[in-house]
Amino acid sequence: MDNNNWRPSLPNGEPAMDTGDWRTQLPPDSRQKIVNKIMETLKKHLPFSGPEGINELRRIAARFEEKIFSGALNQTDYLRKISMKMLTMETKSQNAAGSSAAIPAANNGTSIDSIPTNQGQLLPGSLSTNQSQAPQPLLSQTMQNNTASGMTGSTALPSSMPPVSSITNNNTTSVVNQNANMQNVAGMLQDSSGQHGLSSNMFSGPQRQMLGRPHAMSSQQQQQPYLYQQQLQQQLLKQNFQSGNVPNPNSLLPSHIQQQQQNVLQPNQLHSSQQPGVPTSATQPSTVNSAPLQGLHTNQQSSPQLSSQQTTQSMLRQHQSSMLRQHPQSQQASGIHQQQSSLPQQSISPLQQQPTQLMRQQAANSSGIQQKQMMGQHVVGDMQQQHQQRLLNQQNNVMNIQQQQSQQQPLQQPQQQQKQQPPAQQQLMSQQNSLQATHQNPLGTQSNVAGLQQPQQQMLNSQVGNSSLQNNQHSVHMLSQPTVGLQRTHQAGHGLYSSQGQQSQNQPSQQQMMPQLQSHHQQLGLQQQPNLLQQDVQQRLQASGQVTGSLLPPQNVVDQQRQLYQSQRTLPEMPSSSLDSTAQTESANGGDWQEEVYQKIKSMKETYLPDLNEIYQRVAAKLQQDSMPQQQRSDQLEKLRQFKTMLERMIQFLSVSKSNIMPALKDKVAYYEKQIIGFLNMHRPRKPVQQGQLPQSQMQPMQQPQSQTVQDQSHDNQTNPQMQSMSMQGAGPRAQQSSMTNMQSNVLSSRPGVSAPQQNIPSSIPASSLESGQGNTLNNGQQVAMGSMQQNTSQLVNNSSASAQSGLSTLQSNVNQPQLSSSLLQHQHLKQQQDQQMQLKQQFQQRQMQQQQLQARQQQQQQQLQARQQAAQLQQMNDMNDLTSRQGMNVSRGMFQQHSMQGQRANYPLQQLKPGAVSSPQLLQGASPQMSQHLSPQVDQKNTVNKMGTPLQPANSPFVVPSPSSTPLAPSPMQVDSEKPGSSSLSMGNIARQQATGMQGVVQSLAIGTPGISASPLLQEFTSPDGNILNSSTITSGKPSATELPIERLIRAVKSISPQALSSAVSDIGSVVSMVDRIAGSAPGNGSRASVGEDLVAMTKCRLQARNFMTQEGMMATKKMKRHTTAMPLSVASLGGSVGDNYKQFAGSETSDLESTATSDGKKARTETEHALLEEIKEINQRLIDTVVEISDDEDAADPSEVAISSIGCEGTTVRFSFIAVSLSPALKAHLSSTQMSPIQPLRLLVPCSYPNGSPSLLDKLPVETSKENEDLSSKAMARFNILLRSLSQPMSLKDIAKTWDACARAVICEYAQQFGGGTFSSKYGTWEKYVAAS
């Protein structure tokens, strides 16, 4: 064969223009028929499920036909290629069961001297679309079929691949016979045109340009500079392993096998464990002593799907032993590729099933795209390549991880191998940074990573040349697919940091493999990794400002990162079709539908993700408790695991990135949302996230250092008993649970709406789990690492609420628990630290006791003041008891004290503690002496206030003021009515008052918020006179002032609150004032009060708020008014200054659930009112000339909202005032018509049913000032009318309004006429002014 066969030139004599002519002459329906035929063939050989599978097959067939159509030279070539493809599929199906294991050893007799000749043929442009070599059609077709045969390094090459010139006919026959059902051979051969150039350049560092053919280099090769550096290091390392030990039997390999070995490994360059062993003897046969490796490539011609490794253990063992017999002198190096040269796929053992499935998930969805790859669908190859290009960084890091492990394993081998270990150690050091970068990658590509690791793990076993290690192959596979449970075991139990565990932690279906993984990690000898990795973790965190000193235990950081990945940032188990189907459609559809689906999922994420995370954390904590050795509840544990897995799937769905949205997901978004809503309805916390709460960074100035330290202690008290018990037991998940627990407990302090998932941990630990003395000792030691250290850490956590779930939240636990490192040897040093910290703890507690006694005296004074104010609040108390009784909480005073002492627990709605849920205050306080000595009611209250810790109060609370005194009082939200989504929290003063009076339950705040606004703090101030105990002046003086005037409290509160809170308060006050004015039937006067009520949504919702306010002020204290006094929509708006301005707000407001008494009373006399109204209108029309009053139909309403007025309970009659201008002179009429002057528009009013007791309401907007345009007569008349209307007495009559409107209209017309000389009026109307006066 000559080299012309490889050139992409057209056959001799065929004009280039003919390429397009045959396409235009092809009948339009013939292509569709061909696509249908291809699809029918695909259906025979590929499994598919439902319409999605059919659509997938249709897309594949269409894209395949399009590629053939665009690449064919003529119609005959087009049909021939498609026929060959289909024939190959049929042949593959028939021969799927038969294939030989390896190329006969007789081929080894060929000399290697012909390699340079073969190299010369692999020149630039060595690909052709011309399949003119008839003697080898099947091999050519095989090469075509395997553009996408699963080789992770191959790109979409032209669809038709002629034979490799360097392979003889004899070799071709052998390959065809042995690989009829293995398309990987062609995939190996496709990149042969440039592989030797690449191999030679691998010694030149990251410069990877292929000789003369940069355009044909795969995209993955262009994007992986770091990968090639790693490959270079591996090459050099393997040379060190082989030099001096192995001769160079170049005569063992035939030239075509040498060439194919290059082609086999280069497309699989992502498998870095394979690539290090790639020999370069084809280019530099005298430089690299890697012939034993080359000899093993004899069998790689018959090894399809190197990436999936679908072989059986037994065959691998036989194959390895046979290869070792063939090459005894290269036993150590030969194992590297023995398992890669896999046998046919016809027998897949159960051990290999899961790796196979994972690789199928990489290639496409679960409907069988993997098999389509075997049939040579170029489309699938493109999908795979697109997806793999997005995953290059992750795969890079995974390869570095595998390389490290592959070099660590020989540590346990004989000394001969240990002598060669230093290069591996050096390379391990050089690869730490890349390994660490892995932990910051999103873990959404786990399935690809897992499948990618399998061949590398197999290389680990065979690299040392010890066939007995094959017994651990199952464990190695499990290393490729570790789960959360596996991580917990091998990280905490052995003090290891498993990079693979980090990569694939979200595959919980493999938890039963924990013991084998554990033992295998011990065999691998990876104990050298943790120190380096932990140092790097510390350096990275310190560089990002997340570590303030050397107090950060590396193991806790490791666990923290894993937990954060689990709960916040991962895509644990997306449906198998999610990853690659995105790559299929991303380029085709342009991402339009992706954006739409992504926005839907984003909105769902904002709505549901906080609740799901809350439930997930609670379940995870519960799972940790129940997994302790003392509690053997296997069934319940299994249910919890399943429940957690379902939660992970939901969170992963909500956290899907835009690039990973697949077409199938588009139709399932609504279904998933329905499932999530149903799930949340069953398991949602009883109170949603409170609105209007400030982040904790704004709460920090309100707290004294003592309060912060107490908060930190209470946090540790929740988690330290559990961690102590687990440390003493030496349980595997100890470090995982402790870090996760601390992270979650700290998240509480900065995630306002998320309940603490493990708040009941201390109460659920049996007493037996805490050995005598150890629990308290550990608590005391960890509670106070240093007094100032705790305070600083608390401030750091509180001021970083936004990033509490991205790593900062565990800093406090790490600071307070320096002894929880990855090694169990530190427990001896731990006890020494505990003794020292115990002394600090006691000193701190003594100081704290003195402050608490002072606080107790202040509490007594507050109780006395509250007792005096109790009588005035009795009615409100009863109302609030009615509300809170629905919660069924019944938290007594003593229980409430325990409830509050648990740090953040009082801030979350799910903690409805039962008596005895907390074992004792002593346990919570860590055997604090002041708790046992001062358990009086005063101390109870004092501790409650002191222990609230980082309170999260409403954003508009006027009581959040810095206090210069030493009283560490700070407002804290309590549990409020769970049925009110916007319920604001009570102030601490109300909490103290509740305890003093023994009131059961948590009192509902008087300021009931609404979805659109935050609750009014001024109303809260008015309705809670005892709330002044928290005002700054009161706290400063230390003595509540009983004689303080309400106006002083008001002024001080207004000065202390934020503009948003003040706006909300004024809006609520204005709403109530205007509502009272409307019910009374009087106008607001100048309109300033009515103009305040702007938020009508809030006005219609805050029923209890307005009622309590009016009851406080004595306006409407009757029960009837309480039931009926609601901020009703203003349809009967009182005539007044700015009532018309407010009309649009009222017209669009929600339907009131209650009516005003005035409106309901007027309904009874509606017929009488209408009769009297008609009589009055008739009388008005008799007296007025230019103004006509008439009853307007609803159809005449210019604004459709007017029609809705009568339908929302405010019935009345619409009256229209029309200015007909009959008194104008003909000259003025002609002038107005000639200038196209707009006439004065009619004025519409709504006469209520209560008329004449109620004033009519304007339906037209009244202008605030006169328009500057002289021609706008209507605007001028309305402006005048607006001014004169305010002088009318209340209630206004229709007659007075009509007279006023008529006078305004005449005055405007008169002014307009005077601009034209004043002579435009007839002398008959010369006494215009007198007529107006007489009327």
From Swiss-Prot:
Record's function text: Component of the Mediator complex, a coactivator involved in the regulated transcription of nearly all RNA polymerase II-dependent genes. Mediator functions as a bridge to convey information from gene-specific regulatory proteins to the basal RNA polymerase II transcription machinery. The Mediator complex, having a compact conformation in its free form, is recruited to promoters by direct interactions with regulatory proteins and serves for the assembly of a functional preinitiation complex with RNA polymerase II and the general transcription factors.
Quaternary context: Component of the Mediator complex.
PANTHER family referenced in this protein's UniProt entry, alphabetically: MEDIATOR OF RNA POLYMERASE II TRANSCRIPTION SUBUNIT 15A-RELATED (PTHR33137:SF4)
InterPro entries reported for this sequence: KIX_dom_sf (IPR036529), Med15_C (IPR048386), MED15_KIX (IPR036546), MED15a/b/c-like (IPR044661)
Listed Polar residues bias regions: 110-158, 190-207, 241-257, 271-299, 315-328, 363-374, 437-448, 567-588, 716-728, 735-749, 756-815, 1148-1160
Family: Belongs to the plant Mediator complex subunit 15 family.
Keywords assigned: Coiled coil, Nucleus, Transcription, Transcription regulation
Low complexity composition-biased segments: 258-270, 300-314, 329-362, 401-436, 498-525, 688-712, 957-973
Alphabetized GO MF terms: chromatin DNA binding; transcription coactivator activity
GO BP: any one term: response to salicylic acid
GO cellular component: mediator complex; nucleus
Gene: MED15A
Record's protein name: Mediator of RNA polymerase II transcription subunit 15a
Pfam families the UniProt entry points to: KIX_2, Med15_C
Stretches of the chain forming a coiled coil according to its record: 834-882
Entry keyword Nucleotide-binding: no
Localisation per UniProt entry: Nucleus
Disulfide cross-links: none
Chain intervals for the UniProt region annotation (Disordered): 1-27, 109-172, 190-225, 241-389, 401-448, 496-525, 567-591, 683-815, 947-986, 1146-1165
